Amino acid sequence: MQYVVVIGGGHAGVEAAAASARLGVETLLVTNNVMNIGEMSCNPAIGGIGKGNVVKEVDAMGGVMALAIDRASIHSRMLNRSKGAAVWGPRAQADRKLYKCAVLELLTKYEKLSILEDHITDLIIENDRLMGVVGEKTGTIKCSAAVLTTGTFLNGIIQTGSERVEGGRFGEKASQCLGNTLRRHFKISRLRTGTPARLYKDSINYSALVEQPGDSPPIPFSYMNTEITVPQVSCYITHTNGKTHEIIRNSLKFSAIRNGVSARGPRYCPSIEDKVVRFAEKDSHQIFLEPEGLDSELVYPNGISNSLPKEIQEEFIRSIAGLEKASVARYAYTIEYDYIDPRELRSTLESKRVKNLYFAGQINGTTGYEEAAGQGIVAGSNAAGAGLIISRSEGYIGVMIDDLITLGTNGEPYRLFTSRAEYRLNLRSDNADFRLTEKAYRVGLVDEERYAAYKKKYDTFHNYKSKLNELSTTPYELAKIEGISIAQDGVRKSAWNLITQPLFVFEDLLRIWPELSEVPEKYREMLTINARYEPYLLRQEQDVKLLRNNEKVVIPSNFDFGAIKSLSSEVIEKLEAVRPETLAQAKRISGVTPAAIVSILIHLRRLGAEGSQPFPKDLDQALRQLN
């Protein structure tokens, strides 16, 4: 009989346990504290650029996160809305209490899922096969598979200035016994992350801040929801200043992360100490003041995580506009913890060393709630025997897992970005259900209700698309309509052809074919996005094939990687350090993504690089859309 044990009740553990239970397998979720299931340990928000796509992918496969945030969303925004849909990033601020309540309520509806409050101290491994786990209070628990989603708890050390305590999170003890067990079986390294202080709301001078309202109406994350019913509130923006930076610079010798903590933190979510040192030329850094809940007295100051002593935290916080009289409810800290080398995992997230043992979340070297959830749904599904593998072309979850198991983390927490995906034109936040719901349904992750909703949406979309392809007119007829300009080439054009053009909007089609007014607003946007991207998706596939044929392209010794705007600072830093001689060498550098290689190839081709093969006609123009 199958019996899956999930260790840890964070975002990875929640999705792993829910996925296993949805597949009809008896599942046990073991957590240190039932009331902390779904806890947002750091910022009270879900989503963002790249991250929001993962949440939509988890939802497309029947997951929990999107449903939970829709019940707790108090401030919703679509990031990058002014850019192409491929880089849109849905994001929502959460009411912490509402989010945890929603997660727990959703989990309790699974008949096959039980929850146990205990500390897992050991693993039972025989002949390189997991046979069970050992609980501090429960003792031996036999199982067919287990998923480790321990977050920052493995040998966690919390530091604020010179204060150093063992802990997996504020107020919770670390998992030392389990951490020591893993050290006997796996290659273990250390990472760190941090969190800022929490401030009392009534001590903040909001008149000195810039208000940032959310989108109206707020857009749900889940494909199963049509609206957000939770009251909405604003966030606020302020900035550090010269005085703030001076206080921090003069106090670096007291910072834990500058003195003694050797583990590396997240590159793209640096502490304020790192910002002041790494970006010394900057006069200020932006801070978002995010409410922790509708009835919470606390505010999360996003952008000033640190490990400075408490008195220095108060001093630099009060040097910031609007925070001159700020009262600290809880001080910032950094936490150092164990993680495994994810290159020792299969694409199912099963260990190569120990059969039936799966890993998901920060234990794999990632950072972020969303990355954890994406790994959790894959690990939990496969622990239950689903055989679920998501490819790089199917989802950001596939990009992330492939990056982890082939490249590793390069010693720093892994964060997902749209730039990591060579297929990003298709991996959009608007089409995750079209990409993954059918696949998830086939393995049993998606129930009949969700699948029926997906099929209705899919069929409706394609019916409307067919109608747009059937309707056609001539440039001559279009010229008679005021405000519509099109080349008089004599070629008959369908409504679908017209909407592919950037200057055409769906409302223009209504002036030509009034009968299209029956198309609902959400389908108008879907049709427009798909029409605009369709020609480039075909060329994107050509681009990926071309890349495989250009691995021997020579990279000049004086090539300026920094001139390629689409490359991240992380990738540029690694390329400059190694100075690869060919594209093949560049591909083997840990952290240099396939998307980055594509960008390099484009620029090399324009320079007439030695060994590069000719691009198909018009491909240069198409590839520019990827950068």
Swiss-Prot record:
PROSITE patterns assigned: GIDA_1
Binding site for NAD(+): 265-279
Membrane-spanning intervals of the chain: none
Residues reported to bind FAD: G8, G9, G10, H11, A12, G13, I120, S175, Q362
GO CC terms, sorted: cytoplasm
Domain of life: Bacteria
Any Gene Ontology biological process: tRNA methylation
InterPro entries, A to Z: FAD/NAD-bd_sf (IPR036188), GIDA_C_N (IPR049312), MnmG (IPR004416), MnmG-rel (IPR002218), MnmG-rel_CS (IPR020595), MnmG_C (IPR026904), MnmG_C_subdom (IPR047001), MnmG_C_subdom_sf (IPR044920)
GO molecular function, one term: flavin adenine dinucleotide binding
Subcellular location(s) per record: Cytoplasm
Family: Belongs to the MnmG family.
Function: NAD-binding protein involved in the addition of a carboxymethylaminomethyl (cmnm) group at the wobble position (U34) of certain tRNAs, forming tRNA-cmnm(5)s(2)U34.
Subunit: Homodimer. Heterotetramer of two MnmE and two MnmG subunits.
PANTHER family, A to Z: GLUCOSE INHIBITED DIVISION PROTEIN A (PTHR11806), PROTEIN MTO1 HOMOLOG, MITOCHONDRIAL (PTHR11806:SF0)
Protein name (database record): tRNA uridine 5-carboxymethylaminomethyl modification enzyme MnmG
Native organism: Neorickettsia sennetsu (strain ATCC VR-367 / Miyayama)
Gene name as annotated: mnmG
